[in-house]
Regions:
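N-terminal, polar/charged subdomain of small-to-medium soluble alpha/beta proteins
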Residues: 1-87
Length: 87
């Protein structure tokens, strides 16, 4: 079972990026019932707006999120959908 919570993802992102204007973390695991969703961990969606992302390409914004969550992902994130924008 995954040790990851929405609170853990949110606090990790806030600590790493600091200047977050909007953040929504949603557990979507229930949409992926069955072996793929249950066995490997949890499915998450992160919607984030951050000053540091202003002017960055979509790929660079996603990299910021992945870099911030590098210590959390192995704890049970199977899939991560990211909607990221600058402010």
């Amino acid at each position: 079972m995954s040790q990851v919570t929405a609170e853990l993802i949110e606090s990790t992102l806030r600590a790493a990026l600091g200047d977050i204007a909007a953040l929504d973390v949603v557990n979507e695991s229930h949409l992926h019932a069955g072996p793929a969703g249950a066995a490997e961990g949890s499915h998450w969606r992160v919607r984030i707006a951050c000053q540091r992302m202003t002017g960055l390409s979509p790929l660079a914004r996603h990299r910021l999120v992945y870099d911030a969550l590098q210590s959390v992902i192995p704890q049970g994130i199977h899939a991560l959908a990211i909607e990221a924008k600058g402010v």
